[in-house]
Amino acid sequence: KDFTKRRMLHVVLPLFIVSIIAFLDRVNIAYAGLTMKENLPWLTPEVFGMGAGIFFIGYVLFEVPASLIAARCNAMHWVARIMFSWGLVCILMTTMTTELEFYIYRFLLGLCEASLYPVIYSLLIPNWFLPKERAKAISLMLTSLLFSNIIGGPLAGILLDTTFFGLHGWRTLFIVEAIPAVIFAFIFAFWMKERPDHASWVTDAEKA
């Protein structure tokens, strides 16, 4: 039981937080669209819909290749890298001024997030949990999506009416929700370990 609690703290909890941040950065475009048209006259409903969909083109194209790359390197470091990357993309979205830039940033965001859940499901969770334990670990981690939906709307509403270092509306939303991804990428790299034999908090008996 003690080992299970420690795995919840050191494995499931950091993955839970990563999943929340990923989901918020993925869907905040829906809320940002409420004010983006004020500054971007070219953002017609057709352009907005295309940009929202282009995210999934990047996601689908790179989901398998990126996951294969992650399997060949340290999966924990890979998650930290892609998290840092999608945070930067979200920050860069505050600078977009053209339709093409909108499409490019949405594609890059999909590319960066593409391998997150495959790496979690196929590498990190299996490294830490026996087959009979994985369903519980994954279900607990996936409650992050429900939690994200609960906080996402109210948080977006607040940020859209907030000025942050001279930025207002949708730009505030993008940058404030991107900062946690950039910062937590470094925290995750030290907090999470790829497998039990890499973790100092796992005893020799538990590693066996």
Predicted regions and their residues:
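Symmetry-related core transmembrane helices of the 12-TM Major Facilitator Superfamily/SLC fold
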Residues: 171-190
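Cytosolic juxtamembrane N-terminal segment immediately preceding the first transmembrane helix
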Residues: 1-29
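Extracellular/periplasmic helix-loop-helix junction of adjacent transmembrane segments
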Residues: 30-61
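Glycine-rich segments within core transmembrane alpha-helices of 12-TM secondary carriers
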Residues: 135-160, 180-181
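Conserved MFS/SLC helix-loop-helix module at the cytosolic interface between two early adjacent transmembrane helices
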Residues: 61-100
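Cytoplasmic helix-loop-helix junction between adjacent transmembrane helices
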Residues: 105-143
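Membrane-interface helix termini in secondary transporters
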Residues: 35, 67-68, 158
